[in-house]
């Protein structure tokens, strides 16, 4: 291969250095926890005797939704504190004016019209003549700024009434349109409109036709005051966690789940600083649960904090966020991605047994998606290598009844009983998913100048196992394409006259070599 050979070896060594160090640290951590006295009892020991069949539906919403204020509070760059509405000596807030009883829709319209009249907008007398006497006197005696603050509160209260009527009247969508128009006229909030945002969230989840209007309203709230973004996000993130209690196949309204996730991602995209703060905070929460699981390793049920649908789908959501926002906020995503990726790999390594291969495949699928969306190299070969002996191992056939019983859908499964490991159907399902993910993963980097070094371990192990078993058509096809791509890239780099330290030349090489033109790339293109 000439000059590129030594440089390629050096490139591979440096590229995997951080990964090797991370694995050593994880191994040392597990060794420390493993040497503890197994007979001791922890004060916070998880409740024993929990039915293993129900662990995937354990409700951990509070753990995963709570975010420390210090981690997520948005800096205001010197803007005033919006938690309390302060009015000067000549003014008053709406909360200081006759709040003993809730105003009717008619009273609110009259008050809004009178505020606009005092501000110079022409209003018919019939619109404002019924304004409350106390409120009228207050509005007459305050300055323009104080009156504007009262007007915003009146509009907020009016919008909440319209949204309440949305669910109980036939003209619900007409009320929603009026509420949206009112919200868009609000220029500032005296405090976080929790009632309003909660109503918007409930309508978004339960009424698909209203989602576009709800999205406009929420975007407006976050844009006029970015410090409210965290609280708004938390309100909408809560129902998402409710969806995450069960597997995706058990969700009654999958479209709502998808649209809610996309809406939250769009909400994060409104502000780069908000995206950075909220992502760090929630990923830190997930990481804290993993550390708690390791600390409580003496308990046989400690792993249930991590190995459940809520944790898995929450982690996958944040991996999806990184993939989706990479192009818009690349620098921030590069800071966040190592946390999410290392957390995912550590979760996989927590219980790396064959029973939990479905969970591993769920997480690997998200990591492969990041590789595809960002072209970020994540060393996943070892994760695939561990599963290859199992998927190619020969097993004695079980009875037809047991085979049907153990024919799990990988999409709706995180783990399987130990008896299922003998099932041919389970092994076939795992093999299919492993080959599919490996094909996509290696196709992504099939134009990399280091592809031969990347694929060599997989080729060596697969070739040895294939000779000892009946691998099947898909495995042989994958192996042949992998070897062909190995030779293809090696031949293309044979005569290069630069080293891998010359990043501009490396990038030019990989840019000229379209991954779709490689044997592995063509295999993916043909199957999609």
From Swiss-Prot:
Q: Locations of Basic residues compositional bias?
A: 1-16, 25-43
Per the record, the major location class is nucleus
The family this protein is said to belong to: Belongs to the NOC2 family.
> InterPro entries under this entry?
ARM-type_fold (IPR016024), Noc2 (IPR005343)
Residue ranges, annotated region (Disordered):
1-59
UniProt keyword list: Nucleus
Q: What is this protein called?
A: Uncharacterized NOC2 family protein C1B3.09c
- Give the matching Pfam families: Noc2
Q: Where in the cell is it found?
A: Nucleus, Nucleolus
Q: Please indicate which superkingdom the organism of origin belongs to.
A: Eukaryota
What is the native source organism of this protein? Schizosaccharomyces pombe (strain 972 / ATCC 24843)
